[in-house]
Amino acid sequence: ALMGVYGRVADVLIESATLEGDKKIIHEKISRQDLAKMVGASREMVSRVMRDFDEQGFIQTLTGGAILLNERRAESR
């Protein structure tokens, strides 16, 4: 079930991103609370997932709060 939350968060992030050149970027801010509601998990769990994704290089938070996705890293999980 734990992997399910990671997968659902990844799906929401990928669907929310727009392609700019060869980069996928999420410009609109999605609060941890909103993300938690979307994936049916607690805010704490979503925060942990986002922290793990950041540490693994799947996401990178840019100045101003936009999120850069590195899907190649996600697919290698």
Question: What would you call each of these model-derived segments?
Answer:
Residues V5-R8, V12, S16-R77:
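Phosphate-/nucleic-acid-contacting segments
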